[in-house]
Each structure stands twice: as C-alpha cells, then as structure tokens.
Amino acid sequence: EQQKYLNARKYIELVIVADNVMVKKYTSNSTAIRTRIYSCVNTLNLIYSAFNTHIALTGVEIWSNGDKINVQSNSSVTLDFFGTWRETVLLNRKRHDNAQLLTAIDLDGPTVGLAYVGSMCNPKGSTGLIQDHNKLDVMVAITMAHELGHNLGMNHDGNQCNCGGNPCIMSATLDFEPVYQFSDCSRDQHWRYLIDNRPPCILNIPLRTDIVSPPVCGNYFVEVGEECDCGLPANCQNQCCNAATCKLIPGAQCEDGECCERCQFKGAGTECRAARSECDIAESCTGQSPECPTDDFQRNGQPCLNNQGYCYNGNCPILDHQCHNLFGAGATVAPNACFDFNRKGQGNSYCRKQNGVTIPCARKDIKCGRLFCVQGPIGNTISCQSTSSQDDPDIGMVDLGTKCGDGRVCNSNRECVDVTTPY
C-alpha cells in the first residue's frame, strides 16, 4: 500500500500571483508576465518529472491595481501575509493545492525565495515567495522549484548530499548556472515526507479545462486538444501514443489508466480497485473509460467489525485502533475514568476550542474529545495516556465517526449523537 502510494502520479494545482512591483517592472505588460510564468512552469515540470509529479498551472493572478497584501523586503513577514491571504481569500475563490507569490521587490539580504517546509496542502503553509531576480526565466524557475521543494518536505542540502557532482536544486545558495537535479538527500526527505504525511490534495487529476497555461505536447500531461501525452519523442515509452502529435495511434482507445490495457478499454465489470475493508466497495471498469470510477464506499452509519463501530467514509473507526496508531499494538482504550478528564476542559483534555478557549465535554460527549489509552493489563493503578500537537489540533482527538455508545457516533462538533444524524 505504501509503495503504491509513492508510485502513484502526483499533481500539484498551482496558482502564481504576480505583485504590483512586477507589473511596474514589466511596464504593465501582462502578456510578458504571463509568458515568463508559463516558461517557469514548463521548467518546473522538467525538474519535477524526477518525482513523477506534474505541476498544473490552474491560476495566474496579476495585481495590476495594487497589492492585496503588504509586500515588503522582509521575506518572513511577506510570506506570513501571503499565507494568510491565501487561506482567507484565495482558497475561497479558487480550489488549488499551492500558491507562489512572484515579486520584483529586492528581498532582504541574499534571499531570493522563502517557503514553509513540509506544508503541502496546508491552507496557509502551502505557499512560497519568489523574487524575480534574474533575466533568465530558467533561473527564476529553479528558485521556484527550490521553494516548492521545501513545501514538499525537503531541507537544504548538506555537504554529504550529491546529485552527480553538480550543485543541486536544494543547495542553500544559488548557483550561477542552471541546475535541474535533486540530491540523494532531497529524494530521501521527499519520500519520507510523503510516507509520514500523505498530503491529500496532490492525488486528484486536474481538469484539462482548469489549466491556464498553453498546452505543451511532451510534458506527460493530457491537456486541451491532446488525446495522450507520453513525453518527448525521445523519451516516450508508450506504444499507444504518437509522441510527436499527442494523438492516439490508429485503432487505440486509450494511452494508460487502471482500465486501459494494450491501448484498449478493459471490459465492463473488470475490477480495478479492491475493497479495502468491509466499509469499502470494490470498483469495476465501465468499458467506456480508461479510468477506474471514483472511489465509493458503504453507507455511513452501517455497523462494522462485529458492531464495534460504524462505517464512516470507507473506514470503521474504533477507539482501540486509534490507540494502536498512537501508542503501538499493545495499547487499548482507557476506562471511562480517564475520559472524565475531558469534562474539566483543562490542559489538553477537552472537546473543542473556540477562539483559543477550551470547551469541556458534556458527560455524554466525553468519548468524542481527547483520546485516552492504556498500555498492557490494567492493574490497581491506571495510567491514562494521551497526546497532543500544537501544529495539528486534531492529533490525539477521537476520530470523527467513532462509536461513542450504542447507536451513537462522534460528529464534527465532537458531540456524541444518534448514528443517523451526523451524515
């Protein structure tokens, strides 16, 4: 399962914002700004093909009438403002995975870019700041690839890191020559980040109609006007696609996909995604498409694991399993006496937070707040174990949809309600 996730093609739906100083630098020529951005994205795709990741430019915003945040040379402050703007404004206007601010302001000191580390899909953190620091498109694109690398869990390369004797993308200092390779350290950090965090937003395939950059035959992504795209002719390894035209060969129905075999659609009814659990449903090919249908699951609220839980979005969340995940296989759910701490609303024991204030659980809701576990057999003394994280307030809390009583489950407000009501 882990290897399957790592091998799956990833897609980053990217929005690039050009600030008002960019507008002035290019004398209000929005076409020139867009052309530069398109060129940068083409280079990004060349670089990130090493990770089987496609960068889909789904939005370009040019602040022609003035900046929408306070853009200043202090890179940390500007990135903070931009992240907040993305979270509160841009995401409400347009769904996307990552946003980069391209500025013509001279950032502080030698800085030409800044980004949060390991933050892909985070509403504020999936952002970067790029200075338009070089006449060459490719040099700005490499800086963007570097900052995007931070978002994807990569740190700066140390002396022990290498990518074949040349400076690498994640080098701490900018080289004067274009570099296109990630180091062995970057690869390890990126895979570890994906395994540990599984950022959820980078698996869906963007709609062709959402992409704003001109179609490029040879970038491994099927865009408007193309039937297939297997890369440049010298690199194409797909017998179903004409790499020079990005059209299917005569007689071919498809290029690839879970329901495509030898250039033809698999027959209707061919299983393409097995059921992961009793709460999941197996999917089968339609005979009319190369793609496996959208992942579906049993109805929410259906009893599962011998009535220990109720199905929720394809899983069967129960307290014991959540204890195993947090504290290891020997951990089990704690007695009710531990969960009574949630009624106090002190420390990390509560049901929810409102405006930074912890709200204690009502008696009926104690098993929907902080999760408490115990290790090994329970003797005369009970040691209630729990965990929490400042970075992610949901870590250590009981999962949504968990059974909290007969015919009752935890809803999104951390209340224990009738199983027929929260869905």
Curated annotation (Swiss-Prot):
Give the Gene Ontology MF terms in alphabetical order. Answer: metal ion binding; metalloendopeptidase activity; toxin activity
Q: Which residues are sugar-modified? A: 29, 74
In chain numbering, motif D/ECD-tripeptide lies across: 278-280
- Biological process according to GO: apoptotic process; proteolysis
Write out the residues that bind Zn(2+).
146, 150, 156
KW Hydrolase (keyword) present: yes
Q: Disulfide bonds, which pairs? A: 121-201, 161-185, 163-168, 217-246, 228-241, 230-236, 240-263, 254-260, 259-285, 272-292, 279-311, 304-316, 323-373, 338-384, 351-361, 368-410, 404-416
Positions contributing to Ca(2+) 2 binding: 216, 219, 221, 223, 226, 229
Residue ranges constituting the Peptidase M12B domain according to the UniProt record: 10-206
Span-the-membrane segments of this chain are: none
Q: List cellular component terms (GO).
A: extracellular region; plasma membrane
What family is it from? Belongs to the venom metalloproteinase (M12B) family. P-III subfamily. P-IIIa sub-subfamily.
What name does UniProt use for this protein? Zinc metalloproteinase-disintegrin-like batroxstatin-1
